[in-house]
Every structure is written in C-alpha cells, then in structure tokens.
Amino acid sequence: MAAPSGGVNCEEFAEFQELLKVMRTIDDRIVHELNTTVPTASFAGKIDASQTCKQLYESLMAAHASRDRVIKNCIAQTSAVVKNLREEREKNLDDLTLLKQLRKEQTKLKWMQSELNVEEVVNDRSWKVFNERCRIHFKPPKNE
C-alpha cells in the first residue's frame, strides 16, 4: 500500500505510527493471503500459483519500499528540526521552552529511528512466510 497522496505528516508521531500501521496491512495479512491464494498440493492444478506468488512478491516489494521511504523521509525531516533547535539553543541557553521543544523532537527522532528496527522485523517475518509457501512456485529476481 502506498503512502497517501497528500504526503506524510511527520510532525505528530501518533499520526506517523498510524500511517505505518495502515501501510503494514499487507504484512499483517500475508498468512491469510497465502492460505487463500496459493493452493495446497491437492488443488495445485486449479490456480496458477506462480503468477499469484509473483503478484504477491511485487506487492510486498512495493509496500516495503514505500514504508522505507516514509520512515527515512520523516527521520530526515525530524533530524533537520532537531539540528535547527540545537543551533537556536546554543544562542539562547536560558530559553527553557526551546529546551523542552528540543527534547521533545529528539525523543520523536529516536522513536522514528526505532521504527526502522520494527520494519526490519516485519519485513523478515513476511519474507519468511512468503518463501515457505512460494519458493516452489516463484523465484524472485537475484538483483532484488
């Protein structure tokens, strides 16, 4: 699932997390998807499993790339905000509001960076399940 066309709101971490949750739907439902679309041995002749696995592979690749872009884009945006706040803080050491805002943005940045680790786990799980069911029907290209 691609990111919404209106762009991604990186300012509110809760919205960022909700977007990722929606974008991870394909990964959350992969077992169900494979069970309903890739035939068992007894039904192998009725459905083109290689085409089904290829389509699922392409969907997973697109979803993973899209989420990776969203996460890295938000990390870059938030890093820039943190950098600017640090520079302002150096000029105004007595400004407690500025310090509070800097801490808030630093925390948000750490949470966003931790989403990269979550993403790695989600992707690994999806590829494991995909390979268990599709390895005999579809071989992904070597360069990906």
Curated annotation (Swiss-Prot):
Pfam families the record matches: MIX23 (PF09774)
Keyword Coiled coil: yes
Coiled coil, from the record: 82-120
Superkingdom, taxonomy of origin: Eukaryota
Keyword terms, alphabetized: Acetylation, Coiled coil
Residues with N-acetylalanine modification: A2
GO CC, alphabetical: mitochondrial intermembrane space; mitochondrion
N6-acetyllysine modified-residue sites: K100
Family: Belongs to the MIX23 family.
Protein name: Protein MIX23
